[in-house]
Every structure is written in structure tokens, then in C-alpha cells.
């Protein structure tokens, strides 16, 4: 079994492999860190490589912490009936992974988000590692696998739902029967697509 396959198998069931002990120690440090932290190398090298990561100049990885569960909605300031406040059980239309990608993009405004993957969770938070690309770096412009990100069509791609997590949330992973209202976009079909 190759090294990448070995890592992949271990992360399939982290609670039953050596990953559990590593995560227990890691998360004690992660909880004390800020929301967005740049990391030297990916925690899950197999997942990062499959999503387009390369150990070269112009490519960085950032770990982002996001809350778990439903939306933490602010309480209305003006008087309302408790029944109509709609405080609890409100779910965002955007996935937590997309929120993590957007936070990383705001922290590094000169970089574009390539992709992201999960690296752990506890009772309160989820952690994602986000791969970011510097589209103005010469080594990125000369790389055939990243060249299309430098054309200008992918500016602020994470805020337009063009990452893998964004397309999944917009329903673009489905096609055929049942996906008639998904394309070209949700708002183009009176929000009946999702």
C-alpha cells in the first residue's frame, strides 16, 4: 500500500485509526489559535494533492475554524411575539465549508480559493484547510494546471459559488431529472432550484 493510500484509509474512519490520537493533541492547540491561521504544509496531504495542492511558490494553505450547527441569529431589538422571532432552528442556505472558504478569502484578499477539505471537528467548531493560489505569481502563471485561474474569469470565485463546495450548495452537482430548475442559477428560476 502506498503512503497516500495509507493516509487516505486512516482518514476514512479517524476514530478507529491512529488519527484519533493525533487529532486529540492537535485540537488542544487549534482551540487557542485565531479563526484563520496559515499552515506550513497540509494536515491531509492525500486530500490536498487530489484537490490541486502543489508544494510550490504561490500556493498556500490556511486552516479556518467555523461554528457548528445552525445559524446564530441576533435577537430582534424591537418587541415581537416570541413565536414570530424565528430565533432557533434557522439553517443557512450556505454550507459551513463555504463560510470557511469565504473567511480565508477575506483574510488573504490577493489570493484566490482553489478548494478546501475538512480536518476535524469538536462539540463547538469545525476546522477546514483552504488551498489558496496567488494568481499573479510567475510560477502559477506558467503552470498548466493553474493557468485558467489567472485569466480573470475566476476573480472572487469563492464569493460567486465557483468552488467545489459552492457548486454543490447551488445544486450544480446534479443533472437530469429533478435538476430542471437548477441552471443557469437558482434566482433565474424563482428560487425553485434548491
Curated annotation (Swiss-Prot):
<dbReference type="InterPro" id="IPR012678">
    <property type="entry name" value="Ribosomal_uL23/eL15/eS24_sf"/>
</dbReference>
<dbReference type="GO" id="GO:0022625">
    <property type="term" value="C:cytosolic large ribosomal subunit"/>
</dbReference>
<dbReference type="InterPro" id="IPR020925">
    <property type="entry name" value="Ribosomal_eL15_CS"/>
</dbReference>
<dbReference type="GO" id="GO:0003723">
    <property type="term" value="F:RNA binding"/>
</dbReference>
<protein>
    <recommendedName>
        <fullName>Large ribosomal subunit protein eL15</fullName>
    </recommendedName>
</protein>
<dbReference type="GO" id="GO:0003735">
    <property type="term" value="F:structural constituent of ribosome"/>
</dbReference>
<dbReference type="InterPro" id="IPR024794">
    <property type="entry name" value="Rbsml_eL15_core_dom_sf"/>
</dbReference>
<keyword id="KW-0689">Ribosomal protein</keyword>
<feature type="region of interest" description="Disordered">
    <location>
        <begin position="165"/>
        <end position="194"/>
    </location>
</feature>
<keyword id="KW-0687">Ribonucleoprotein</keyword>
<dbReference type="Pfam" id="PF00827">
    <property type="entry name" value="Ribosomal_L15e"/>
</dbReference>
<comment type="similarity">
    <text>Belongs to the eukaryotic ribosomal protein eL15 family.</text>
</comment>
<dbReference type="InterPro" id="IPR020926">
    <property type="entry name" value="Ribosomal_eL15_arc"/>
</dbReference>
<dbReference type="InterPro" id="IPR000439">
    <property type="entry name" value="Ribosomal_eL15"/>
</dbReference>
<dbReference type="GO" id="GO:0002181">
    <property type="term" value="P:cytoplasmic translation"/>
</dbReference>
